[in-house]
Amino acid sequence: MITIHRVKDLRAAIRQQRTQGKRIGLVPTMGNLHAGHVSLVKQAKELCDYVVTSIFVNPLQFGANEDLDKYPRTLDADKEKLVAAGNHLLFTPEVSQLYPEGLERHTKVITPGLSELHCGASRPSHFTGVTTVVSMLFNMVQPDVAIFGEKDFQQLAVIRKMTRDLYLPIVIESGPTLRETDGLAMSSRNGYLSAEQRQTAPLLYKLLQESAEQIENGDKDFAAISAEANNRLTKAGFVPDYFNIVNSDTLSPAVPSDSDITILAAAYLGTTRLIDNISVHLG
């Protein structure tokens, strides 16, 4: 595996692979890699000849009071995991390399509508930061395929919309959410949880499963299902952000006639924001 820090070196390395007819895959990450990230790299290897993983803690997608400064940076351990997974190129730019004029003066990529719902309502500038940096990575690497995890379901939908709207010749693939043995979705932020919070955290997925089962069994009172889940989260010590039952394609509120439904959930446990989702296919 080679490690590259500068855009011009990245482009030169990619160009060399292109001249050999290689199919390029991209896995964008913010580092602190876990088994979920590694599974995306392995998926990229199955689909492509040459895999590029980026590690960049993107300041543009963090709000003013969020965890940019304390976000875990574990580059040496990340490199070991990537080498073991068979990754070919690691791109780890400095902030000054990607945002030479600073964040305020940098051109932004905005996906109206979809990016304003759910997580976007709570974190207004978050998805603008995501789509901006991902579009930059797409332009630098020009991959044939890019792979994102399904745990960040809304992010995946936003990136698909951006790719479609801008006519980018990139196939967006997704990898399934990997979970701990007790059901908690793997996340780089799980390390923030105290031992007691870690015991409580799996309730979020348990409620998603129970709510999905209710819907599969014919319960279409989505508002009541959401209200009950939020109430149980609150009683357990969470501060719910949302527990929304949506159309899987549009992410707008689900209606009883929808056949593909996703339940999106976000809640704070202490200062840690956990997100998760589950999909329901009816008929």
UniProtKB/Swiss-Prot annotation:
The keyword Lipid metabolism does not apply. Pathway: Cofactor biosynthesis; (R)-pantothenate biosynthesis; (R)-pantothenate from (R)-pantoate and beta-alanine: step 1/1. GO terms for biological process: pantothenate biosynthetic process. (R)-pantoate binds at residues 61, 155. Disulfide bonds: none annotated. One of its GO terms (cellular component) is cytosol. ATP binds at residues 30-37, 149-152, 178, 186-189. Its main location: cytoplasm. GO terms for molecular function: ATP binding; pantoate-beta-alanine ligase activity. Keywords: ATP-binding, Cytoplasm, Ligase, Nucleotide-binding, Pantothenate biosynthesis. Homodimer. The reaction proceeds by a bi uni uni bi ping pong mechanism. Catalyzes the condensation of pantoate with beta-alanine in an ATP-dependent reaction via a pantoyl-adenylate intermediate. This is Pantothenate synthetase. The lineage of its organism: Bacteria, Pseudomonadati, Pseudomonadota, Gammaproteobacteria, Oceanospirillales. The gene is panC.
